[in-house]
Amino acid sequence: MKYSASTSTPKSAQPKEEELENSLPTNADYSKIDVSKLSEMMQRYVEVKQQYSHALLLFRVGDFFECFFQDAVTIAQELELVQTTKHAGKEIGRVPMTGVPHHAVEKYATFLVEKGYAVVVCDQVEDSAIAKKENRQVKREITRILTPGTLTDDGMLKARYNNYLAAVVIAKNYWGLAYTDISTGEFLTTQTEGLDQLTQELMRLQPSEVLFPTKAPDIGFMLRPGERSDHLPEYLPHSFCYSLRPQQPFSLGEAKERLLMKFQLASLEGLGCERLPLGVRAAGGLLEYLEETQKENQVPLQRLRSYTLADFLILDHQSRRNLEITQTVRDGSYQGSLLSVVDKTSTAMGGRALRRWLQQPLLSLKGIRARHDTIDELIQNNDLRQDIQRVLRQIYDLERLTGRTGAGTANARDLVFLADSLTKLPELSTFVSQGNSPYLKVLQKIPPILQELGKKIHSNLVESPSQKLKEGGLIRPGINERLDEMRKLAEEDQKWIASLETTERERTGIPNLKVGYNKAFGYYISISKSKANLAPDDYTRKQTLTNEERYITEELKEREVRILTAQDDLNELEYDIFVDLRNEVGEYAEEIRNVSRAVAALDILCGLADVAIYQNYVRPTMVDSRELKIIEGRHPVVEKYLPAGFFVPNTAILGSKNLEKNNSGITPYSAPDLIILTGPNASGKSCYLRQVGLIQLMAQIGSFVPASSAVLGVSDRIFTRVGAVDDLATGQSTFMVEMNETANILNHATEKSLVLLDEIGRGTATFDGISIAWSVAEYLATEILSRTIFATHYHELNELSSILDNVANYQVTVKELPDKIVFLHQVQPGGADKSYGIEAGRLAGLPDSVIARARQVMQQIENHSKIAIGLRKGINKKEEEEIITVEQLDIFSEEFGDSLL
């Protein structure tokens, strides 16, 4: 593996030289040390470290994994461990050292990887006793390279999250992307135009690591989140880890050859990506990285599949965030998200798949209806659904167990869990045998070999095997004749040892004589100091302790050699039998994963059926039109957290006739394309917007929806502009962020899109804001023709409905009482003329004097200002121009100021 041996770091992570000199202990930088003067062990450490200068090196020394020099300083700081020093050679002296117990290395390595570091594990690959006997250093080799995107162990992964490794290739405005989760084997690639779409696709995937080819001198370095390099394009999201890679593996020729060899193909046509050169390059470069990092553990990836962004409903990052699909806007938590409400899956793989469904809703009516059909059948057959879920709860993570098995890293317990799951599949198949819907039919025929594999694993492995593969205790009796014979001989020797204590007590007359064993000294005979004078002449003293003497006899020594040798041979044979079994199971990784995907999908649909029953959801009618008709819709998350019956349902009807243009403008509509939604602050406008967006999204993942009824045309995109935040990282104000997001919507929305806008134009001066809001709404209604709900406090926009036939006014109603207002949360036809902002401030707890003064100022403003916007009814751009007149009394004039005093 070729990595830059340079110790330079990316500029954003590079401390000043004087800071390094003041903060690091003496000899913290190995590059400034004469390596020949280091001890032999330290020379080996530096040799490995120079190969992997970009990574943190954990180096096995006895019962610990230790790191030295700058790595020791880094790890001590990141893990909050005690840093000490270690002697590195007579002329070198002591160098920084930090260590972790060998049995806890996985835990500490996981912490480091989560912080964005690559970790190289260099382990002892032979018995240290052998090296000691031969008076040499124990052999150490790299056994694992851990990076954020290449983890497979359960302890390092979140069960219900995919762990994606992505690779990106960019050519001008075109880009190719490949990604995989090596723990599950999925492997996909795509290629398209538009760098903004690349950013959005990366934000959808949330990869743990992104590979980027470059000619940079810092090849091999991993940029942690927030770190940048001159060789990394600025438009790539800053929130990911980037590994800077050499360009050669990403060349088309080498990438193509690597893919063909990996999947044993003659051409790329079999993968469907022969016309995606950038996607092929990204996929080939990703494969090369896996070959380098996984060493001998070749990852059993599924065949590369290509996809296009147009296959799915597109949600940009801001829309996913605003709709709170997988996490809340406020604190990024899972609770309070849509996922927290609809995830009733029983398996980890079902949980991961549901997350993917929510990120990529379907566009295919056939695909959507197939999911609805399955949920319908599961709701109608309650016993069937409960039987399926009972079996699902007994199925482990087939995808990841299969991944570790195919990669050769699964332990015996993994195989037992895999067998437990495989032997449950026939029962699942029996339950769905009478099913009529697509997702039930697919599991009616499960390959018989999978059950046979499960039975074979159970018949070969003991019920509760050790997780340590080279210490025996794995294979059942009767599996291997030679193993049984060796065990019989070993048992006879153990019986002899067990009887030795009784025999020697009788022979010596020492009643408290004991026979013991430890790893350092082997077997021994123990006699207390007070009885040591009774030890027979054939006893040879082996060790003296405070209260006892330990002896050995020639016969015991011979038995010890035989027992230990036999045990080593036994353990080795058991390990070999286990590896053969694991390899055999690994050959069927593709078949197991195909079934696991079907199981995960059925798991999701059973859970969605449960949600539909308990939350009173209905099946939406999906149509091939622009219609959106939600009767008494409810916000799926808000209603869940309110007492039963407290949520006020609301109807939304948009675009129920296909649009037809003629020379005079737009034909009349039975339902508008654009709704101007007005109403008080805190009355529920934003909730209504999100509610409509979530119902559309839920329908397109195949879920039932919270409403009395729903008729929905398929949306190609859902855009949301809800809430206001600045972006300090890029120096953008709240208003500039709002304008950028609005521009993105206007440039990408189509007549099949659903657009949900809240408070466009509020971040600037009032009349600038009104002008922008009016123009945006008008453009959406006349040029894009998307289905839009436009929430605003600019009541002037209500005039649009009198000008454009496909615009309607709706308001969130309130009830005015003498001393307060009551929010009714009902959306009804008509435009509001008040925002009740002062009342909202009173409810929030503003001081009474502030409220009183605000009312006084508002009265004066209403008496002295006037805004009038008029448009000629009907729009014909070629013949007429819009006329907008704004008359405004300067509220900062001396006359107006005096009136407030």
Swiss-Prot record:
Q: Is DNA repair included in the keywords of this UniProt record?
A: yes
Q: Composition bias, kind Polar residues: at what positions?
A: 1-12
Matching CDD domains, A to Z?
ABC_MutS1 (cd03284)
Which Pfam families does the record associate with it?
MutS_I, MutS_II, MutS_III, MutS_IV, MutS_V
Disulfide feature: none
Top-rank lineage group of the source organism: Bacteria
A cellular component annotation (GO) from this entry: cytosol
What biological process terms from GO does the record include?
mismatch repair
Which amino acid positions bind ATP, per UniProt?
G679, P680, N681, A682, S683, G684, K685, S686
Q: Record's NCBIfam families?
A: mutS1, PRK05399.1
Q: What does this protein do?
A: This protein is involved in the repair of mismatches in DNA. It is possible that it carries out the mismatch recognition step. This protein has a weak ATPase activity.
Similarity remark:
Belongs to the DNA mismatch repair MutS family.
Q: What is the protein's name according to its record?
A: DNA mismatch repair protein MutS
What organism is recorded for this protein? Trichodesmium erythraeum (strain IMS101)
Gene name on record? mutS
